[in-house]
């Protein structure tokens, strides 16, 4: 009987943590969606981008959502690959300072454009607009996370 008493406490605490995780994730995705909706409206207003894919709600979510997810994957993969190179070659001048950030930015922008963006024919954004958007993302990353370190590594 004692086993079931402790088991219920574990189940309740797990459900509480899971509920908080799901709610915070949903709020994050909602804010991300509103932010990207606002970005798309700004691009349309200034005639910098055109979004012509207009089916039902689920198809739009899958089409535009996959564009965002694949783009995030490219940014994430390049960032980790460049960090790996920087750790393997610490004395290389190409992987230190602002030149490292410039190489990361250029590689990410070119790979995003030629791997992801070209295949989405209903999203019409010029290369220079994508370059400015990704450049702003890198600038914000440098401002808000200047020298972030992995807190999980215990030395």
UniProtKB/Swiss-Prot annotation:
Q: Does the keyword Lipid metabolism apply?
A: no
Query: Which terms are listed as keywords in the entry?
Result: Cell membrane, Membrane, Transmembrane, Transmembrane helix, Transport
Q: What membrane topology does the annotation report for this chain? A: Multi-pass membrane protein
- Give the record's GO CC terms: plasma membrane
Q: Decide whether keyword Transmembrane is in the record.
A: yes
Q: Which Pfam families match?
A: SepA
Q: Where in the cell is it found?
A: Cell membrane
The regions listed as transmembrane in this protein's record are: 17-37, 61-81, 103-123, 125-145
Q: What does this protein do?
A: Involved in multidrug efflux.
Protein's recorded name: Multidrug resistance efflux pump SepA
* Provenance organism: Staphylococcus haemolyticus (strain JCSC1435)
Q: Which gene encodes it?
A: sepA
């Amino acid at each position: 009987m004692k086993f079931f008493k402790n088991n219920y406490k574990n189940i309740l605490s797990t459900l509480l943590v899971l509920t908080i995780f799901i709610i915070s994730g949903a709020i994050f995705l909602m804010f991300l969606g509103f932010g990207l909706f606002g970005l798309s409206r700004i691009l349309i207003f200034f005639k910098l981008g055109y979004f012509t894919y207009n089916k039902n709600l689920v198809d739009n979510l899958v089409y535009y959502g996959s564009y965002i997810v694949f783009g995030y994957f490219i940014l994430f993969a390049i960032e980790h690959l460049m960090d790996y190179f920087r750790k393997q070659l610490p004395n290389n001048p190409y992987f230190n300072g602002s030149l490292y950030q410039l190489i990361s930015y250029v590689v990410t922008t070119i790979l995003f454009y030629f791997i992801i963006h070209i295949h989405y024919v209903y999203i019409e954004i010029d290369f220079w607009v994508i370059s400015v958007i990704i450049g702003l993302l890198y600038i914000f990353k440098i401002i808000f996370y200047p020298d972030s370190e992995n807190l999980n590594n215990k030395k």
